[in-house]
Every structure is written in C-alpha cells, then in structure tokens.
Amino acid sequence: MQKILLMVDKISTRAGQISAISVVLLTALICWEVFSRYVLSNPHDWVFDITYMLYGIMFMMAGAYTLSKNGHVRGDVLYGFFKPRTQALFDLILYFIFFIPGIIALVYAGIDFAAVSVAINEHTTQTANGPPIWPFKMIIPIAGGLLLLQGFAEIIRCIVCLQAGEWPKREHDVEEVDVDKLKAMVSHEDEKKGA
C-alpha cells in the first residue's frame, strides 16, 4: 500500500515540478515584454493572454503537488492538538463531504469546457489576434484528475492512519528553508570558527 501512495505522490510531485517551468517562462516573457515595450517601443498584444494562461497553469497544476506535500492551508488551531487518529477521522469525513464531490464536479465541468473549446478552436478575445485558448482549458480536467488521484491517496492515508495510529510516510521533495534551523546552523558554524 505504501508503494502505491508514494507512486501517486511521485506523479503529483513530477506534475508540479514540470508545471513550475511556467514560473520561469512567465518571468522571462514579462521581462521580454517590458524590454520590448519600453526600450524597443514594440509591445505585443498576445503577451497578456499568454501570461495569464501560464499563471493559471501554474496554480491549477500546483493543487495536486501541494496536496501531496500536505501543504494546503487548514485551521490548525485545534487540529494540531488532535492525535493522528482523530486528525485522520476529520480529514476522511471532509474528503468525502467536500473534496471528492467538488473535484469530481471540476473534472466533469472541465471536460465539457475543454471539449467545446477544442471543437470551436477557441481563441482569446482579450486581443484582436488572440492565441488559441483551448490548450489552456484542457489543463482544467487534467489538473482536476491529478488532484482527484492525489485525493484518493490521501483517503487511503487516512484509513491507514486510523488503523495504525500514525500517518504513513510521504515522498520527500525540496522543503522550505526553516529560518530557525538555518540560524542555528550558521551560529553553530560561527562558534566552531571562533573556538
């Protein structure tokens, strides 16, 4: 069971890492457009459309990645004091009441939304010669499907935690820098040099 959970985590992590490229593309595109507009006096109409599409891709594809890292915001005022079994019970109830129905609705509506867009070869209407928007709209059901897959993995994690009394391990990825640990490490290094 743990292998399956880690495999789903890995899929979500890879999808998040691949979509993180949109941050680099978005930054480069905005920098180029600022240079082109103010230095070359040659702005491009389509850049606005592409930037909001890249921004949307970044956030839609980050959902499953964030869920796989248990990184979504939650009210930890009481939750953090609960034992793992109680946490798992609350999570399990909330996954079935809110998460699964909401994500299924997202995928269902997203498939129709994308299919219509592909069928009519939809282009953006923000600019006169807007780029095609159907590739962007196809991301909606894909991101929803990845989020649903990760949600099922989280439900399995809750069930395992209810049985075992502790949370199963997650796939490790690059973590945020813990400032306190970093300060302690630097002060420890400074103490070594001073001694």
Task: Tell where the protein language model's regions lie, with residue ranges.
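Alpha-helical transmembrane segments and membrane-interface helix-loop junctions
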Residues: 1-195
